[in-house]
Amino acid sequence: MSTSPVAIVTGAARGLGLAMVERLLAEGYRVMAADLASAEASWNYELGDINAMSAALEANGEDRLKTCPVDVTNADSCAECVDATLKHFGQLNLLVNNAGVVDSGPIDTFSEAAWDRIFAVNTKGIFLMTQAAVQALEGQENASIVNTASIAGKKGVRHMAAYCGSKFAAIGVTQSLAQELAPRGIRVNAICPGIVGTAMWLEHLMPKAKSTSNEIPDFADYVSQLIPMGEPQTAEDMADAVVYLARTNNVTGIALTVAGGMEMN
């Protein structure tokens, strides 16, 4: 049986999650890539589809990578994802709680349904996946949880009360779990991306965009005014941060900002 470490990555079908999966595979991990079963779930931009990702992976013959559907807002679904991982790989060393959604708008008209959905995915999802995985992580070598937060979890942004609130909460949950789980040998950290040209953000902020920031010349000009280092972050930058936090031995409870100097708190 392989002794290489095993990771679960949620929100894995595209964007940051897909880059994390690819980087973890390159680092020798075996990976369970988890996301919604269909991109047709109702939201203000196209969501990931793990079934489509699974078909592509099977065509490539990658045997260190498996996929499973997960709805991180549903406790049973989270438990089934962890169970599937243990059944296939036999262990779990790293949980990457990356699933997330975004929406924005003035408080006068922002819908209660959107508010609830954002908190359910971005914050409750961390709780449910961690609850499902914690016993499997305990006792494993260098067991670790990495949560995707945001620089919007460190500083409020106009018209983004729900998203910012959910990411502030994600950092608070990270710090609390780091305290609680340290005696059980599990480290818990967060990454805080800056402006990343993923489809989630481009399709929300720039509805005509459908894939990457490279297709939107104005995007680079826009972010260069906001970021001291002059260019947007990439999904690969976030994957680098996940690998660092997964591999280090004595770091827990931090919210690691990867934002080119845009946020220095």
What are these regions (language model features)?
Residues S2-F89, D103, P207:
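Short-chain dehydrogenase/reductase
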Residues T130, S166, T174:
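Active-site helix of classical SDR
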Residues Q135, Q179-P183:
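Alpha-helical segment proximal to the catalytic Tyr-Lys
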Residues A182, R187, N250-G253:
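Short, small/polar-rich loop/turn modules that mediate ligand/substrate recognition or access, typified
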Residues E231-V258, E263:
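C-terminal substrate-recognition "lid" of short-chain dehydrogenase/reductases
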Residues S150:
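Residue(s) in the substrate-gating loop at a strand-loop-helix junction
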